[in-house]
Amino acid sequence: FCIISIEVQPRFDLWDQDWKVPLQYGFRQVFGENGGPGGLFHALRVTPPIIEICDNINTICPNAFVFNYSNPMQRVCQTVTTKYPKMKFIGLCHEIASMERQLPEIMETPFENIEYRAGGLNHFSILVEARYKDSRKDAYPIIRKKAHNYYKNYINDHEVQSQKPGGERGVFFELFNRYNYIPITTDSHLGEYIQWAYSVADHEAIMDFYNKYKNQCLTFYESKESYCNYFDLKKKPKERVVSIIEGILNDLNYEEAAVNLPNKGYIEHIPNNIVVEIPGIVNKDRVIGVKLENYPLDFSSLLINQASVIRLTTEAILEKSKSKALKALLADPVVDN
């Protein structure tokens, strides 16, 4: 097993450049990490060293399972799986964990009594279905009925410093109101892919999230403590990769909530081989995606807008082509200048 979780340093100085350089030319970004100009610059910076790691994996242990945590997840995974289509390369993201915290409160039942499936692109996914295990009752009507009041008052003290109710829900509510499905993430990520997002995003809450994340990272980087002292290794790990590795070693054939894999008809409206985020079945041989039946065509139209950007970014990196990088930027729906 190989786990990739890297950043090119100095992480936050470079991220500031991803924000400020486009701003000098009049371009405003919602977050600048995974989409738009910042997402492209980030991908061009971090993907080459990940490709180098995968070159070594392909030489030393070509049958290894490779798990990636590095952003921009979508573009990293697309580039690696294009160069190494036979590599067991799986992208993992933490956003799906929001469902484990929120659905039990909305549905008024323990998480163990909930079945759900979500999918789309990384950081651009929706809750597709949810039901109660005991009664098999469809829970989406209840979720839709309660969603506005619940999220309007939801305080995300898990990731932000302030206690502002309903923070980072501007783009979230626009998508829910228009498409009638619950996004599994918030404005900072959703807003990176949609051309009209800047005008409705909660920028104050986004900066609150960014500042807390930055402070946490810098505190850890600057700490002289060892990993063993900084983290409580006696606690049961919450990282989903642990459960996935257990599932592979024990051939459990269980369904994992979210993995990033090349599309093989898992979302029918998305071109094949574009990396999608979908549930996956974990066994000793591989992690295989689960087809999301009846995925809403209207929402997938937003996802399709990213397909050409993703492909051009991949080609730019693998071919080391400045021309392809510029074309990826020009194809991005959020680039309006």
Where are these regions (language model features)?
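Rossmann-fold NAD(P)-binding glycine/threonine-rich loop
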Residues: 13-84
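N-terminal Rossmann-like NAD(P) cofactor-binding module of classical short-chain dehydrogenase/reductase
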Residues: 1-6
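Rossmann-fold dinucleotide-binding core
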Residues: 55, 60, 65-134
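Flexible, glycine- and charge-enriched loops at secondary-structure boundaries
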Residues: 43, 89, 320
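Soluble or luminal CAZymes and related metallo-dependent hydrolases
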Residues: 42-49, 95, 236, 305
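Active-site beta-alpha loop architecture of Rossmann-like, nucleotide-cofactor-dependent enzymes
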Residues: 9
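A broad, structural surface signal
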Residues: 48, 52-55, 59, 78, ...
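Long, compositionally biased stretches enriched for glycine and/or charged residues
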Residues: 108-337
